[in-house]
């Protein structure tokens, strides 16, 4: 797999994120000029889900009212359908991924919850 076909995927529920979020999202495409980059909002994510999974998941996605939960469902749907790198919208890119990850091997990253403070978390 080459880097330029590995999609970077981000989600913000509205078409126009707040300036600080938009700036952080833009940083990912700037640090990865040869990569495929897709930013989804609620509408474009719903279309993607409809195309890849059909009406049931599409309707369930649209019934979700919390944007963070929408992002959780869409993350799984997008990565299952096409693979790629999911990047939380609030995450700032400081350096290209090629510099610190071996992306030629299958990889899943997840941060483990602290034992005294269990929670669902993503990395």
Describe each region flagged by the PLM.
Residues 49-67:
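ATP-dependent phospho-/nucleotidyl transfer catalytic cores
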Residues 70-117:
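GT-A fold catalytic core of metal-dependent nucleotide-sugar glycosyltransferases
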Residues 1-55:
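N-terminal anchoring/stem segment of glycosyltransferases
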Residues 14-21, 64-72:
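Aromatic-acidic/polar surface patches that form glycan- and anion
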Residues 35-39, 65-69, 114-116:
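Short, surface-exposed, polar/charged, turn-prone segments marking secondary-structure boundaries
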Residues 26, 53-58, 104-105, 109:
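Generic alpha-helical propensity signal that fires on short helical segments
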Residues 30, 34, 63, 102-103:
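Secondary-structure boundary motif
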Residues 119-123:
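Substrate-binding rim/cap in mid-to-C-terminal beta-strand-loop elements of soluble/periplasmic
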């Amino acid at each position: 797999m080459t880097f330029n076909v590995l999609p970077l995927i981000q989600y913000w529920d509205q078409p126009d994120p707040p300036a600080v979020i938009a700036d952080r999202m833009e940083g990912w495409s700037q640090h990865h000029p040869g990569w495929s980059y897709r930013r989804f909002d609620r509408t474009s994510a719903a279309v993607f889900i409809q195309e890849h999974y059909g009406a049931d998941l599409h309707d369930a996605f649209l019934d979700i009212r919390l944007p963070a939960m929408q992002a959780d469902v869409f993350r799984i749907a997008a990565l299952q359908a096409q693979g790629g790198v999911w990047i939380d919208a609030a995450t700032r890119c400081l350096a290209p991924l090629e510099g610190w990850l071996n992306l030629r091997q299958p990889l899943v990253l997840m941060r483990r919850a602290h034992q005294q403070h269990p929670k669902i978390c993503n990395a």
